[in-house]
Amino acid sequence: MNVLEFQSLCNSISDEVARLLVEVLKAPEDFKASDGNCALCIMNAAGETSMRLYGNNPVRQRQTAFNAHKKALQVWLTGYATGTFEKLVYTDQVSEKQFGLSRPELIGWLGGVEAKTQSGERLILAFSGMRGEQDVGILHQAAEKLKTFSIVKH
């Protein structure tokens, strides 16, 4: 996938997430997490990155963007969804050191996932700004709706 194709896919995913957010943020507990200010980070195997911010408060957007980017980078380095990786580390099934990480660096929150494009290329998606279950849930909903990528299950 070339850079233009990657950017087109990122735009498509970002637009779908924006459509889904309208409904998801109606739940008070999800809106309250960041007052509707959310961030989506998408990466490919080469490290090319796209970020989309949602909401209208730049300070909150910056915070959620930082978290989404940290989630994406952890998945990019490890190949494991956030939450899953931490479970593996803390049960001594995997060492964080083999990925150049230390335990204080681990994000610990759900919302970062490994995915594949239709052609089998690696894609990393991370979302932040709602409850962790919804951060990852909106990515699954976008995958189901678009069919241009699928979430990798570990």
What does each model-identified segment do?
Residues 1-33, 122-154:
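Juxtadomain coupling helices with adjacent low-complexity linkers
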Residues 33-101:
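Structured interaction and signal-relay segments at domain junctions
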Residues 93-137, 144:
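Sensory/regulatory domains in signal-transduction proteins
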